[in-house]
A protein has these predicted regions:
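Conserved HGGG/HGGXW glycine-rich cap/lid loop of the alpha/beta-hydrolase fold
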Residues: 27-77
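Active-site loop/oxyanion-hole signature of alpha/beta-hydrolase fold enzymes
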Residues: 56, 66-112, 116, 125-129, ...
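Conserved catalytic-core motifs of eukaryotic protein kinase domains, centered on the activation segment
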Residues: 50-52, 75-81, 148-149, 275-276
Length: 319
């Protein structure tokens, strides 16, 4: 009854797309709006519905498709079946794009993606090309995860070794508990180490004091709270971390194939991907324009919500 009072452009619905190598067969996709179809991909640890406040003013012109990556949001119970999680996510997104094009009778659609979601798109472009994507908005994501002799633009920049060592120590500490499914059954020290590491990652993603204060507020757990904390995505996040550390994830060779229009949105204070190296990505892309939000870190919607909305709106309007 209440839902019926909400105008159609502002209502959300959950659609399900058949994807390969999935026990229940389908992946949930949150859909909102009326108009041109747009695919929007979320970041690591994010619920895709966190995009909704930015989309509401645009829902009379665009219909947004927000897939939930396996292990997160409405798909938190859907496991990965491959170690290469970016590759499996790319397979899922290929199925989603094919289905949207079929539903909407389109040859291609616009895509916007942030952080891990953007890394998934590099993997998608490597496997499936650009035929089904008309335009692409890449949000604070580089082409290669690991620093190399000819590439120092990897994750965490000059601090990569330091931060990756922290991740590896956490993974090593959890090895003997691989058989444990519930976070509640882990020893307190490992639970604390896990939540502290996640908080560190989140704080590195933000640059604005208000954003960091919000992260502290949302992630702080007292010892008593930690006892009962049901961390449902714990194992999935560890899987992703293992893959990030072990697999090369270098998509630089893909850049020259992206002849479609690309907008490269960069957080000018990003600590996850050095803005100077992100600008090199712009130069490597044949048909790219660059937008820098000078006061934003990696978490662009959190640090610069107005700027993020304006760039997204401009991208959709082809401005």
């Amino acid at each position: 009854m209440i839902t019926a009072l909400v105008p159609k452009p502002y209502r959300t619905a959950t659609h399900y797309v058949t994807v390969p190598n999935c026990d229940n067969g389908t992946l949930p996709v949150t859909v909102i709006g009326l108009g041109q179809p747009v695919l929007l991909l979320h970041a690591y640890g994010m619920d895709t519905r966190e995009f909704l406040p930015f989309l509401l003013p645009l829902t009379t012109k665009y219909q947004f498709y927000l897939p939930h990556f396996r292990g997160f949001g409405l798909a938190k119970s859907i496991p990965l079946t491959q170690f290469d999680f970016l590759g499996q996510y790319a397979e899922d997104i290929n199925a989603v794009i094919e289905q949207i094009c079929s539903w909407r009778d389109r040859d291609s659609i616009a895509v916007a993606a942030i952080s891990m979601g953007a890394q998934v798109m590099w993997a998608y472009f490597e496997r499936y090309g650009i035929e089904k994507v008309s335009r692409y908005l890449n949000i604070d994501q580089n082409l290669a995860i690991h620093n190399q002799h000819d590439w120092q633009g990897g994750l965490f920049g000059t601090r990569q070794t330091e931060v990756f060592d922290i991740f590896q120590e956490l993974l090593d500490a959890g090895l003997e508990y691989e058989h444990v499914d519930s976070f509640n059954h882990l020893p307190h020290t490992l639970k604390r180490r896990t939540t502290d590491t996640e908080r560190m990652f989140s704080l590195l993603s933000a640059s604005q004091p208000r954003s960091q204060a919000f992260i502290h507020l949302m992630t702080h757990k007292t010892d008593n709270q930690l006892v009962f904390y049901n961390h449902e995505t714990w194992k999935h996040k560890m899987h992703c971390l293992q893959a990030y550390l072990a697999l090369p994830y270098d998509f630089r060779h893909v850049a020259e194939t992206l002849t479609i229009p690309v907008v490269n949105l960069i957080g000018g204070r990003s600590q996850l991907y050095d803005p100077k190296w992100q600008s090199r990505v712009t130069q490597m892309l044949p048909n790219a324009t660059e937008v820098i939000l000078p006061k934003s870190g990696h978490a662009v919607p959190l640090d610069a919500p107005v700027g993020f909305y304006k760039v997204l709106k401009g991208f959709l309007e082809n401005k």
